Amino acid sequence: MSLSSSRIRLLDSATVNQIAAGEVIENAASVVKELIENALDAGADEISIETLGGGKGQIVVRDNGIGMDADEVAVAIQRHATSKISHFADIFSLASFGFRGEALPAIASISKMEIHTAKVNGLGSKTLIEKGEPVCCEACPRQPGTTISVNSLFYNVPMRQSFQKSPQMDRLAIRRLLENSILSTEGIKWTWISERRQELNIAKNQGFTERVALVMGEAFVNEAFLIDKRQNELHLTGFLGSPSMHRSTRQGQRLFINNRAVESSFISRKVAEAYAWMLPAQRYPAFVLKLSVPPMWCDFNVHPQKTEVRLLQEGQIGALLVEAISEVLLHRSPSLEEKMVEPTMESPLIENGGLEIPSIRPVAISTPLSCPNFLQQSFVETEANRALCKEQENLALPIIERVRFLASLGKVILVEDSEGVHALFVQAARKHLFYISLLSKRSDSLLACQMFLVPPTVQMTKLEADFLQTRLESLAAQGIELCRISPDSFAIESAPPFIQEEELKEWIISLAHEGAFQVNESFEQLVENTVQKLAFSKNTRAFDHSWINVLWQIGKPEKAFDGETIRRLVLEEDFM
């Protein structure tokens, strides 16, 4: 635009609505959110959603709320038309979801919309809207309630369309949104049909516990701790995840303030503070918490999508959270004495930074390297595995370089080759072996995977399971064979031998969890990041001595893929 033509002018209504749509409507899930909130505000107790193409093709939301007259529809598609407030001060005592009156006109401006609605004893009407303007309106009977169909989302804003994610990512976003709605409301029937297949069907009489089990998984509910604490005007209720079910991100946290799904870094920090002494570093608790506060204490008008919240009286709210959660965890968790891990030796532990070895007493003498024995109860010995074992036995004293086990000492294993004595750091070595076995894609017999005799099962949320289902072929190529046995669980049929069963389950959950939300990350990067974050055991009993030979065969690396020290020579300076 030239300077001569840059006159100040009023924007036309179509442009204004499309700009508003850019703030309110981020993707198909944003449309679903606005429409179901309108249905809830209309008093509906039965809401059904249908989506095609992840929502970009079609979104249909039906409800049995109070409905509208034809003249109300004409007003509803205009900006700032709302039945929720009449003055600005009303915002601070809201009990409804929507109140700006921007959503419906914003959606209508970037889609082809149809509104079919009727009030009790009303005639009913059907209105067609394109580019935010009504095209036609006709009488059309129906039961009381409203059906809004949104077709060809973003059809007239190609730039916005080009920035949209895949239909699969949109479906995952819609699922999380609907799961939050299921958790935040009771006595409401929810149905979701995606790509003509029913994904959710929640009855009115399904209680909060059943709904949490559906969303978070039965394993979460079975191990979670109930919390119910009242303090003056505050009420905290919900489920606290067992400390053993910690996650690598905060995405396992569901928070509802006054029945609205929100994100609050303040509340997340306070919950983490209560869990702090029970979780490893950089791990986060999972929870489903409902907090009721006086309406004037919270401002949901921070973000156009109303997912962020500002809170007054943070001191009082924070104190309640820490006190109530700490009390539950202390009474329900094992004592500290029970959780203590006894050291394997009296000698001081060896850290990566230096060696402190007052006396070295070998706890086992080197024996011919053999197949991993600590997994023999779980893995079935196949012909391929027997061949691998034989091969490893033959390679126990390789022509290139001999290596033998000397001793286990704290978190390290001491081994000897022609170069001298090496300190082998168990945690880093196992993590590196597991990671490169995934990269090898079964091409290297030294890193071959093994089948489970009795496949263990891993349970997660339905959202995470749906993501994992899309990556089964990629995982199988890496030696992780999974079979979906229920909507929220998988059986693990094979895996590399370098990871223990519980670690493997934790990694698969972390992979599914982060994959469902880190939509901009490649699968290869996702695998690397989740392996890097995984807390492998430092116990030397988790490291089979045959793996020493494997490490030497692949070049006895000094550093793992993430830069962590795998081994280093024991020098005279270490004893001085």
UniProtKB/Swiss-Prot annotation:
Keywords: DNA damage, DNA repair. CDD domains: HATPase_MutL-MLH-PMS-like, MutL_Trans. Transmembrane segments: none annotated. GO terms for biological process: mismatch repair. GO terms for molecular function: ATP binding; ATP hydrolysis activity; ATP-dependent DNA damage sensor activity; mismatched DNA binding. It holds the Pfam family MutL_C. Signal peptide: none annotated. GO terms for cellular component: mismatch repair complex. This protein is involved in the repair of mismatches in DNA. It is required for dam-dependent methyl-directed DNA mismatch repair. May act as a 'molecular matchmaker', a protein that promotes the formation of a stable complex between two or more DNA-binding proteins in an ATP-dependent manner without itself being part of a final effector complex. This is DNA mismatch repair protein MutL.
